[in-house]
UniProtKB/Swiss-Prot annotation:
Disulphides: none
Gene Ontology molecular function, alphabetical: DNA-binding transcription factor activity; sequence-specific DNA binding
Alphabetized SMART domains for the sequence: HTH_ARAC
Locations listed in the record: Cytoplasm
Biological role stated in the UniProt entry: Regulatory protein of the TOL plasmid xyl operons. XylS activates the xylXYZLTEGFJQKIH operon required for the degradation of toluene, m-xylene and p-xylene.
Transmembrane segments: none
Annotated keywords: Activator, Aromatic hydrocarbons catabolism, Cytoplasm, DNA-binding, Plasmid, Transcription, Transcription regulation
Occurrences of domain HTH araC/xylS-type (ranges): 214-315
Name of the protein in question: XylDLEGF operon transcriptional activator 1
InterPro entries: AraC-bd_2 (IPR035418), AraC_XylS_family_regulators (IPR050204), Homeodomain-like_sf (IPR009057), HTH-like (IPR037923), HTH_AraC (IPR018060), HTH_AraC-typ_CS (IPR018062)
Designated gene of the protein: xylS1
GO biological process, one term: catabolic process
Lineage: superkingdom: Bacteria
Presence of the UniProt keyword Protease in the record: no
Amino acid sequence: MDFCLLNEKSQIFVHAEPYAVSDYVNQYVGTHSIRLPKGGRPAGRLHHRIFGCLDLCRISYGGSVRVISPGLETCYHLQIILKGHCLWRGYGQEHYFSPGELLLLNPDDQADLTYSEDCEKFIVKLPSVVLDRACSDNNWHKPREGIRFAARHNLQQLDGFINLLGLVCDEAEHTKSMPRVQEHYAGIIASKLLEMLGSNVSREIFSKGNPSFERVVQFIEENLKRNISLERLAELALMSPRSLYTLFEKHAGTTPKNYIRNRKLECIRARLSDPNANVRSVTEMALDYGFFHTGRFAENYRSTFGELPSDTLRRRKMKWLDPEESLPPLP
């Protein structure tokens, strides 16, 4: 991929020791450690620019380097592969990212990455508060456990996004932007990610001022573990089933059936993520909420949250493990 994302004005290192690059990245971009192959003299390059609350970084270690991070805590990492490839391992899965692909790390995601010798990335560090604000500004609902994205994406999902990043880099390098302008750009990036990438964010649950909708939503919340019929909801709303569909499309942005399914999935995810919840098995949890086809349940869960329910449960158990002890060795 040949895009101008940060030029020599933002250059920090060229032909540098990888550990020097790593130390700088630890200070500004994200906590991690690196492991170098035996032999050879990798020469790293780094471009970095702070733009309001965003950190923009173009990085190459110049060698096959393994990067391990315990998590970003309060930030998201958007990593775009520009050259070479990068092996990602996480929650029992692995994938070779290549140019045109995008890796998105959530704040509590442990990262185990192995760069190819020619790997070059562009990284955007985005504070979680920016995504929270974008949810609020767009009247979307942020789950109690926080916003989570799937790890793997293709830039084709984000039409025009690479051009937006190029504009942000140009703005950061060539002008002294006002804080309000910087905040505006950060909000656009956050809204674009939430709108076009798979995440657990849904529309605002309630639409205040509509008693019929609020009455139906309250009934759903009180009966999530039961079989809820559309006829019963239409009766509660005092309208026909067709009008009920219109009501949900207007106030929830989806159908009644999808709304109920998503709320069940969100409750299951909250239970699986809660260290104080008594969860004996994912299957039992699915059956408890009326998902009798476990394979279809797992697929719906993954398409909604970007991971399998077993991955959510495993992450809760792994949360306090040392990342270098819990991750597989470098091949």
